[in-house]
A protein has these predicted regions:
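Long C-terminal interaction/binding lobes of large macromolecular proteins
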Residues: 1-237
């Protein structure tokens, strides 16, 4: 079963999860959106869609951990979906389509990075090479041409961050163990996939218990809905 649009029911979620399992791990979160163009949308738009889709499976919270770079401490980060979505552009057209940036006498025509761009940049080598790869992909035109495109990177990055604030979800942290500072970067597609995976495996556990107890099929168990299903589960030894 191929899902069109985000899964809106438990049955649709199970099928979306099943379809995504056959794909490479980095793509699974995107596939939850059920959109063939998901990897060609601006990263911030994908982030907002995934937050809205998966937030209901996590109680509206986004949790992650990051290792302190200077001591063995592991830092926990918990954000709310509502707070993150509040950072999204308020106008529907703000984060879509090409835009222009004037920089040192140049008129740069740019587009925002997409998940497909990030995947391509990941294979470019080190961080500097990845940044240059993204600039080459997202710079549509420069008038007059740039002699050294990398010199424009700071200005381009700042303009993209202003236009698409959910393009990178980063949280500054202070380690309680050593007092050092670090930054947590949230991989929203990976978080959304983990949330879906946890939710579906819990559903399948419930299906397994009720199927053994009553002989029902998966479809029949999921059709009960969460409240009736919970009531039956209370009665299973």
């Amino acid at each position: 079963m191929t899902v069109v649009g985000p899964p809106s029911t438990e049955v649709a979620l199970v099928h979306a999860w099943d379809d995504a399992l056959g794909q490479p791990a980095p793509r699974r979160g995107l596939l939850l959106l059920g959109r063939p163009d998901a990897d060609r949308l601006p990263v911030g738009e994908v982030t907002a869609l995934l937050l809205a889709t998966a937030g209901g499976w996590t109680g509206g919270r986004v949790a992650t951990t990051v290792d302190c770079p200077t001591c063995p401490e592991q830092l926990e980060v918990t954000l709310t979906v509502a707070d993150l979505l509040a950072a999204a552009p308020q106008r529907a057209d703000r984060a879509t389509g090409p835009f222009t940036l004037r920089w040192r006498g140049h008129r740069l025509t740019l587009r925002l990075p997409t998940p497909a761009d990030l995947a391509g940049a990941a294979g470019a080598g080190d961080a500097a090479a990845a940044e240059r790869w993204l600039l080459d992909a997202c710079l549509l035109d420069a008038d007059p041409p740039l002699a050294d495109p990398s010199a424009a990177l700071p200005a381009v990055s700042a303009a993209m961050a202003e236009r698409d604030p959910l393009g990178v979800v980063a949280v500054a942290l202070t380690c309680p163990g050593c007092g050092g500072g670090t930054e947590a970067l949230l991989d929203v597609p990976a978080w959304a996939w983990h949330a879906a995976d946890v939710r579906v495996r819990r559903l399948l556990d419930e299906v397994h218990r009720l199927a053994r107890a009553y002989g029902w099929s998966e479809a029949e168990v999921l059709a009960l809905g969460p409240h009736r299903r919970a009531a039956y589960l209370e009665r299973v030894p």
